[in-house]
UniProtKB/Swiss-Prot annotation:
High-level lineage: Bacteria, Pseudomonadati, Pseudomonadota, Gammaproteobacteria, Alteromonadales
Family listed: Belongs to the type-II 3-dehydroquinase family.
Protein name per its UniProtKB record: 3-dehydroquinate dehydratase
Alphabetized NCBIfam families for the sequence: aroQ (TIGR01088), PRK05395.1-1 (NF003804), PRK05395.1-2 (NF003805), PRK05395.1-3 (NF003806), PRK05395.1-4 (NF003807)
UniProt organism field: Shewanella sp. (strain MR-4)
InterPro entries given in the database record: DHquinase_II, DHquinase_II_CS, DHquinase_II_sf
Known function: Catalyzes a trans-dehydration via an enolate intermediate.
Gene: aroQ
Assigned EC number: 4.2.1.10
Length: 144
C-alpha cells in the first residue's frame, strides 16, 4: 500500500523566515517542506503539501486528498475556522495539529483551537522541529 500524508499550512506561513523570527524562527516554509520531504521519502511515504492564505483552498485540498493522514498548521484559522474543523471531520482522515510557537504562552485569543479536541495530537512550541515530530508520528501510525 502506498502511504500518503497531506501537509497543510495556513495563512501567513508563506512569510516564514521573515515574519517575526523571534516567534516563528528563521527557517522558510520551503526549508521546512524540503526537510519533511526527505524524511517522508526515507520512510517510503509520499508527502503532499499545500499552503494558502485562503480558507476555501485548504478546505478544497482536504476534500480532494487521498492521503491517509494529515498534518495541519492552521495558523490564524486555528482560532476562527469552524469550516476547517468541519472539513477535517467530514473526510474522517486522522490528523495532527502543529504550531511553531507555544500558543499557550502567547495572547489569550491564541489559546483556543477549533481543531485540537479532534486531533490525534497537538505539537506546539518546538519550532520547525514540531513538523518533524508530527511526521514521525504519522509515519509510525501509517506503518503500524
Amino acid at each position: 500500500m502506498n502511504h500518503k500524508v497531506l501537509l497543510i499550512n495556513g495563512p501567513n506561513l508563506n512569510l516564514l523566515g521573515r515574519r517575526e523570527p523571534s516567534v516563528y524562527g528563521h527557517q522558510t516554509l520551503a526549508d521546512i517542506v524540503a526537510t519533511l520531504s526527505e524524511q517522508a521519502q526515507a520512510a517510503g511515504v509520499e508527502l503532499e503539501h499545500i499552503q494558502s492564505n485562503a480558507e476555501f483552498e485548504l478546505i478544497n485540498a482536504i476534500h480532494a486528498t487521498d492521503a491517509q493522514m494529515i498534518i495541519i498548521n492552521p495558523a490564524a484559522f486555528t482560532h476562527t475556522s469552524v469550516a476547517l474543523r468541519d472539513a477535517l471531520l467530514g473526510v474522517d482522515i486522522p490528523f495532527f495539529e502543529v504550531h511553531l510557537s507555544n500558543v499557550h504562552a502567547r495572547e489569550p485569543f491564541r489559546h483556543h483551537s477549533y481543531l485540537s479536541d479532534k486531533a490525534i495530537g497537538v505539537i506546539c512550541g518546538f519550532g520547525a522541529q514540531g513538523y518533524e515530530f508530527a511526521l514521525a508520528a504519522a509515519i509510525k501510525r501509517l506503518k503500524a
